[in-house]
Amino acid sequence: MFVGTSLLALAALAHDVLALPNAAQSPSAIRIRKSTATNTTGVFGPDSTIWAEDTPYFPVADYVAPPSNCEIDQLERHGARYPKKSPTKKIKSALKKLQKVTITETSMQFISNFTYDLGEDDLTPYGALQSYDAGVEAYQRYTSLVEANGLPFVRASSSQRVVDSAGNWTAGFAAASNSVYTPVLSVIISEDGNDTLNDGSCAALSDSDSPGDQEAAWIDIYTVNITDYLNAGAPGAGLDNTDTQYLIELCPFVTVANSERSEWCDLFSSLDAFPGFEYYGDLDKYYGTGWGQGDLGPAQGIGYTNELLARLTNTAVNDSTSTDTTLDSNPATFPLNRTFYADFTHDDLLIAVYSAMGLFPTPALNYSSPDDQETSAWRVSEMTPFAARMVVERMSCSDESGSGDGEYVRVLVNQAVQPMPSCGSDDNDLCALDAFVESQAFARNIGMLPRYTGQHWAE
């Protein structure tokens, strides 16, 4: 049995204050950017792969098995959830404006009879199932690494939605093994203190549900025509562009609440809203805990990265950022002898870890237009969808593998193997373990050394 309960989706302030475009300017055509995903099948229709961080999980690429023996570290986001408290108020406010007037546009008629009955923060039944299915998949994929005395070691950040996701994952893992192997959630890390599975350790980053400068500027560009359409179809509603942004959120949230595509999705798909909506999510994460936040955002991922390095090298954790030294110094709460580790977290922490590790290197996003970002690696829909997962595989390879004798590491995000030029990855996108550890200088030196930018080390 699996359970459902809540979430968190943080947004942080931008590192630099940028000159904003004129909000009244006419929007340029918003093109659908090219995806690098080899699998773009959406669970709830083709556009459900571009709902930013509200995207239901989909494998970005087909999984390719590693050459041989592995140790697995998996960092997974909780499953799909209901809106948080603050967005809920804003969604209801915008919806009230529409429902107090007579709607004349045919495509919007359903709104008059729409009842908002979503919960707050908790996992939806679909979100609970996502984590359960992930546990089933993990057992099926890595069966050879599991034995009675070597079950996955599971941790979770203390938010209830994250704890429940971890429990659902262990239930799926056990069910797939016919209850031969029954991993348990061993450690719940309090978000009130040092927690490497949560990005709340830095007071200088705002915990905000409102758009930052870059995102707000983009809202006033991409929603202009959509807002005009909605106001024309509901005379007197008086919607503004921010209202429109929150109304678009109803598509993914109602969909994952009911496990079927919402009428809101069809409305906003007909208005070509989702390419712009996706780019809003990209900006939010990029200037939150991602590359656009200088070193402050990625620094939130240092603690977890150092824990990962400790596991890969079977050495004590060396960190003075967000680790809980009491937990990490105790073999019962931070063992170093397991072949499978599974940690459960939030989307913003995943973004911080990606950025700290040098994954998805991306120059500054143009917050007035996505047109020059068509081939950008920074696509939140493919990085942190609901139930997103980063898997780090440590393996022993022989000369026959094509990578030479020795220990290697590869990193997968939602099944897509990540290129890692910072550690000299080979044609199989494998890095020698020593080279991988050396490449993580930003984390190993507690953010005092530069991060890899994708082409060189940042100054």
Label every model-predicted segment.
Residues 20-153, 157-341, 345-459:
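Signature for phosphate-centric chemistry
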Residues 1-25:
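Fungal secretory targeting signals
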